[in-house]
Amino acid sequence: IPSLTLALVLGGYSLSTTLRGSDASAMPANSTPAKDGDGTSSPEASLAADPAVIESLASWPNVDVVVAARDEEAVVARLMERLGALRYPADQLTTWIVDDGSEDKTPDLLDELKPQYPNLNVIRRQRNAGGGKSGALNAALAQSSGEWILVLDADGQISDDQLERLIPIAVMGDWSGVQMRKAVTNADTNLLTRVQAMEMAFDALIQQGRLLGGGVSELRGNGQLLRRDVLEACGGFNEDTVTDDLDLSFRFLLQGARTTLLWNPPVREEAVET
């Protein structure tokens, strides 16, 4: 009975959050909800549809895309293909891939990819450099200079208009961080991947509910856009924890820096199959 009660409560909460639709807290105070293609309201539709937003962002901010990669030979070429397709001013978008001591063909593939992508910078780290993923991200943070940092996993898959949606929401909404909703690309593989897909969907509903209640969402590592000055004020990425995304969420909150959720388009990643 307790399990059934909990399921009903959580299910009802998720349903009510979904039906409420629009996340008004993600919009600037003077904006008006616009409609997506399915007729529902969303903050990203409001911002993307407002010509004043595009005009005010005639000078788009510099963005650094940062990826920590260890033994990612299976996905690194696809990653760069997607990043190369992003619709954003080329002179204001830089990619940093930190080869974190890879022992497969990742280093060779990155060498082959560099001539194809002029904005690609590769940082090499020894496998025992320490700090884990956070250490790799901090290495890129120290060498880059963009106003905004987009953190992706090597298997992260984003759409070509991702930055066109992310940046207006972040800038016009006065957010210090924007987390993309996470989704799974291989959900139908087996029970384990389906469970992970369900977990990500439910987590997104919880984050949306927090925002609708006037709160903030949490950062989730893959697919997070961060303001550099706030990130640096927080001391960068914490190398002494394995839950660096949750740690950073708390440190942003302690700084008074607000974070929100981008519902569409999501960042997609591969679920663990075994």
Cite the ranges covered by each PLM segment:
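N-terminal membrane-anchoring/stem segments of glycan-assembly enzymes
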Residues: 1-57
